[in-house]
Amino acid sequence: MTFIFNFQFLIFNCKVMAEFNSYLLEKARKSVGNITLCYTRGKNIAKAKVFSRKDNPTPEILAQRAKMKVLVQLSRQLLPVIRKGFVGIGKGSAANAFTSLNMSRVSVDERNVATVDFDRLLCASGMLYPPKVEVTYSEENKLYSFVQEMQDEENGYAFNDDVVYAMLYETVLGRARLVMLRARGENGNTTYALPEEWSHENVKLYCFATLKNGKGASDSQVMTL
């Protein structure tokens, strides 16, 4: 069955009105959704209400949006890291978990400009104990030296074969490097060169541990020089 309509559109007071000719719907009077068919003054008329969306966000909503924007951008830059650091948390993605846990670590000024507190940022989160790692930097050689202290096993919270990682983040360039260190049950020193184009003054350093199978992690800790 085919319906043939001849529409002529008119707009009055946020309503769209269309005059139509249909042999099958002559003198129709019916409503379907936001469309009303009627017969008036010898003509078939279809009326549709136009709904407009009013968006008057409060200061709190604007601040929330600013935080979300900066954290979503950061999560993209750190994606290979947070995929290891946020596992088995809730039903969402690692990026969603990262964003949710770090909302309180972002401040917003009166112009709705968001600033991340990198000294409190979590690039990993979980039930494992954080590893014990210290770092130094050689300006002459442009090398980071990560010194790792062996930890005893704690059933359910720390295992000798847990994998320890360091993460370097260049805050101006927005680039990250993930460095595998040693197993939790080992002492040792691991060196890593400052990447080209990076400025040491802009680098933030973090460490965390994961289960050997990658299905669990510790909270990350910021490392200071």
Language model feature labels by segment:
Residues 2-4, 8-130:
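Long, polar/Ser/Thr-enriched low-complexity segments
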Residues 89-225:
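Charged linear interaction tracts used for macromolecular binding and regulation
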